[in-house]
Amino acid sequence: MNQKLLLTLVAALALVAGVGMGGWFSTQSAENETPQYLQTFPEPRQLAEVTLLNQHGETVTNELFKGHWSLLFLGYTFCPDVCPTTMAALGKIYPELKNISTDSPIQVVFVSVEPKRDTPERLASYVEYFNPEFVALTGEHKMLFPFARSMGLMYAIAESTDNPNYLVDHSASVVVVDPNGLAIGRFKPEYN
Protein backbone atom coordinates (compact mmCIF):
# COMPACT_ATOMS: atom_id res chain seq x y z
CA MET A 1 0.00 0.00 0.00
CA ASN A 2 1.42 3.40 -0.87
CA GLN A 3 2.13 6.07 1.70
CA LYS A 4 -0.52 8.55 0.53
CA LEU A 5 -3.29 5.95 0.58
CA LEU A 6 -2.30 4.72 4.04
CA LEU A 7 -2.28 8.26 5.44
CA THR A 8 -5.66 8.96 3.87
CA LEU A 9 -7.08 5.83 5.49
CA VAL A 10 -5.61 6.76 8.88
CA ALA A 11 -7.19 10.21 8.63
CA ALA A 12 -10.55 8.77 7.54
CA LEU A 13 -10.58 6.28 10.39
CA ALA A 14 -9.74 9.06 12.80
CA LEU A 15 -12.67 11.07 11.52
CA VAL A 16 -15.03 8.11 11.81
CA ALA A 17 -13.82 7.47 15.35
CA GLY A 18 -15.21 10.86 16.24
CA VAL A 19 -12.36 11.57 18.61
CA GLY A 20 -9.44 13.91 18.51
CA MET A 21 -7.91 12.87 15.27
CA GLY A 22 -11.01 13.77 13.32
CA GLY A 23 -11.78 17.13 14.88
CA TRP A 24 -9.24 17.54 17.65
CA PHE A 25 -6.26 16.74 15.37
CA SER A 26 -7.73 18.55 12.38
CA THR A 27 -7.07 21.96 10.90
CA GLN A 28 -9.04 23.86 8.30
CA SER A 29 -7.39 25.18 5.18
CA ALA A 30 -8.12 28.82 4.42
CA GLU A 31 -8.51 28.02 0.71
CA ASN A 32 -10.31 24.72 1.08
CA GLU A 33 -13.25 23.79 3.28
CA THR A 34 -12.05 20.18 3.41
CA PRO A 35 -10.31 19.49 6.72
CA GLN A 36 -6.67 18.59 6.50
CA TYR A 37 -6.00 15.89 9.07
CA LEU A 38 -2.28 15.51 8.62
CA GLN A 39 0.44 18.11 8.32
CA THR A 40 3.10 16.44 6.18
CA PHE A 41 6.68 17.59 6.50
CA PRO A 42 8.18 19.10 3.32
CA GLU A 43 10.91 16.45 3.54
CA PRO A 44 10.98 13.30 5.69
CA ARG A 45 12.88 13.85 8.95
CA GLN A 46 15.60 11.54 10.18
CA LEU A 47 14.96 10.60 13.81
CA ALA A 48 17.80 11.29 16.24
CA GLU A 49 19.52 8.06 17.24
CA VAL A 50 18.27 6.86 20.62
CA THR A 51 18.70 4.08 23.10
CA LEU A 52 15.62 3.87 25.32
CA LEU A 53 13.86 1.42 27.62
CA ASN A 54 10.49 -0.07 26.76
CA GLN A 55 7.74 -0.95 29.22
CA HIS A 56 9.33 -4.37 29.75
CA GLY A 57 12.68 -2.88 30.77
CA GLU A 58 14.28 -3.90 27.47
CA THR A 59 16.68 -1.63 25.60
CA VAL A 60 15.41 -0.47 22.21
CA THR A 61 16.89 1.71 19.47
CA ASN A 62 15.60 3.32 16.29
CA GLU A 63 15.33 -0.18 14.83
CA LEU A 64 11.95 -0.31 16.58
CA PHE A 65 10.60 2.00 13.88
CA LYS A 66 11.95 0.06 10.89
CA GLY A 67 9.41 -2.09 9.07
CA HIS A 68 6.41 -0.49 10.83
CA TRP A 69 4.16 2.47 10.37
CA SER A 70 4.35 4.17 13.76
CA LEU A 71 2.05 6.69 15.39
CA LEU A 72 4.31 8.28 18.00
CA PHE A 73 3.12 10.45 20.87
CA LEU A 74 5.22 12.25 23.51
CA GLY A 75 3.77 12.58 26.99
CA TYR A 76 3.94 11.30 30.54
CA THR A 77 1.74 9.11 32.70
CA PHE A 78 0.94 11.81 35.27
CA CYS A 79 -0.42 14.12 32.54
CA PRO A 80 -3.90 15.25 33.57
CA ASP A 81 -5.43 16.00 30.18
CA VAL A 82 -3.96 15.71 26.68
CA CYS A 83 -2.11 12.42 27.24
CA PRO A 84 -5.03 10.27 28.40
CA THR A 85 -7.31 11.91 25.81
CA THR A 86 -4.88 11.24 22.96
CA MET A 87 -4.08 7.72 24.14
CA ALA A 88 -7.80 6.95 24.39
CA ALA A 89 -8.30 8.26 20.83
CA LEU A 90 -5.44 6.09 19.58
CA GLY A 91 -6.84 3.12 21.49
CA LYS A 92 -10.23 3.65 19.89
CA ILE A 93 -8.98 3.72 16.30
CA TYR A 94 -6.17 1.16 16.67
CA PRO A 95 -8.29 -1.95 15.90
CA GLU A 96 -9.35 -0.38 12.60
CA LEU A 97 -5.80 0.72 11.81
CA LYS A 98 -4.60 -2.85 12.29
CA ASN A 99 -7.12 -3.98 9.67
CA ILE A 100 -5.55 -1.78 6.98
CA SER A 101 -3.90 -4.01 4.40
CA THR A 102 -0.24 -3.03 4.33
CA ASP A 103 3.12 -4.78 4.11
CA SER A 104 4.25 -2.89 7.21
CA PRO A 105 2.23 -3.32 10.41
CA ILE A 106 1.02 -0.28 12.33
CA GLN A 107 2.20 0.36 15.88
CA VAL A 108 1.42 3.03 18.46
CA VAL A 109 4.41 4.26 20.45
CA PHE A 110 4.06 6.37 23.60
CA VAL A 111 7.34 8.09 24.55
CA SER A 112 7.45 9.32 28.14
CA VAL A 113 9.47 12.49 28.54
CA GLU A 114 9.36 12.15 32.32
CA PRO A 115 11.71 9.30 33.24
CA LYS A 116 11.92 10.28 36.92
CA ARG A 117 8.39 9.04 37.65
CA ASP A 118 7.64 6.93 34.58
CA THR A 119 9.36 3.64 35.32
CA PRO A 120 9.00 0.72 32.90
CA GLU A 121 6.47 -0.84 35.29
CA ARG A 122 4.36 2.31 35.40
CA LEU A 123 4.57 2.66 31.61
CA ALA A 124 3.43 -0.96 31.18
CA SER A 125 0.37 -0.36 33.33
CA TYR A 126 -0.40 2.93 31.57
CA VAL A 127 -0.28 1.77 27.96
CA GLU A 128 -1.99 -1.53 28.75
CA TYR A 129 -5.01 0.43 29.92
CA PHE A 130 -5.40 1.87 26.41
CA ASN A 131 -4.23 -1.18 24.45
CA PRO A 132 -1.87 -3.98 25.50
CA GLU A 133 -0.24 -3.90 22.05
CA PHE A 134 0.95 -0.31 22.45
CA VAL A 135 4.67 0.27 22.99
CA ALA A 136 5.91 2.63 25.71
CA LEU A 137 9.42 4.06 25.86
CA THR A 138 11.44 6.31 28.12
CA GLY A 139 15.05 7.17 28.76
CA GLU A 140 17.43 9.86 29.84
CA HIS A 141 16.76 13.45 28.84
CA LYS A 142 20.05 13.52 26.91
CA MET A 143 18.42 10.99 24.55
CA LEU A 144 14.80 12.14 24.76
CA PHE A 145 15.29 15.84 24.01
CA PRO A 146 17.21 15.46 20.70
CA PHE A 147 14.77 12.70 19.71
CA ALA A 148 11.79 15.01 20.30
CA ARG A 149 13.47 17.90 18.46
CA SER A 150 14.23 15.72 15.44
CA MET A 151 10.46 15.36 14.97
CA GLY A 152 9.78 19.06 15.54
CA LEU A 153 8.43 18.41 19.04
CA MET A 154 9.33 19.95 22.40
CA TYR A 155 8.95 19.31 26.10
CA ALA A 156 9.99 21.04 29.32
CA ILE A 157 9.59 20.40 33.04
CA ALA A 158 7.16 23.19 33.92
CA GLU A 159 7.89 23.53 37.62
CA SER A 160 10.09 22.30 40.45
CA THR A 161 10.39 18.53 40.66
CA ASP A 162 10.34 18.94 44.46
CA ASN A 163 6.57 19.11 44.08
CA PRO A 164 5.47 15.46 43.61
CA ASN A 165 2.66 16.59 41.29
CA TYR A 166 4.77 18.71 38.94
CA LEU A 167 3.66 19.11 35.35
CA VAL A 168 5.58 18.65 32.12
CA ASP A 169 4.78 20.87 29.15
CA HIS A 170 4.97 18.90 25.90
CA SER A 171 3.88 18.91 22.28
CA ALA A 172 0.48 17.38 21.68
CA SER A 173 1.04 16.17 18.12
CA VAL A 174 1.00 12.55 17.01
CA VAL A 175 3.92 11.99 14.64
CA VAL A 176 3.70 9.53 11.75
CA VAL A 177 6.91 7.55 11.23
CA ASP A 178 7.18 5.54 8.02
CA PRO A 179 8.60 1.98 7.73
CA ASN A 180 12.03 3.45 6.91
CA GLY A 181 12.10 5.10 10.33
CA LEU A 182 11.56 8.63 8.97
CA ALA A 183 9.09 11.12 10.44
CA ILE A 184 6.86 12.16 7.55
CA GLY A 185 4.20 14.27 9.24
CA ARG A 186 2.05 14.86 12.27
CA PHE A 187 -1.51 15.17 13.39
CA LYS A 188 -1.62 18.55 15.15
CA PRO A 189 -4.27 19.46 17.69
CA GLU A 190 -6.58 22.30 16.83
CA TYR A 191 -6.63 25.18 19.30
CA ASN A 192 -9.99 26.93 19.00
Predicted regions and their residues:
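Short, internal strand/loop/helix patches
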Residues: 124-171
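Thiol-based oxidoreductase modules, predominantly thioredoxin-like and allied folds used
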Residues: 103-118, 133-142
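Conserved helix-turn-beta segment immediately C-terminal to the redox Cys motif
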Residues: 68, 87-110, 128
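Short active-site neighborhood of thiol/selenol oxidoreductases, capturing the structured segment around
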Residues: 60-86, 90
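Extracytoplasmic/secreted envelope proteins and their assembly/folding machinery
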Residues: 84-94, 120, 124, 141, ...
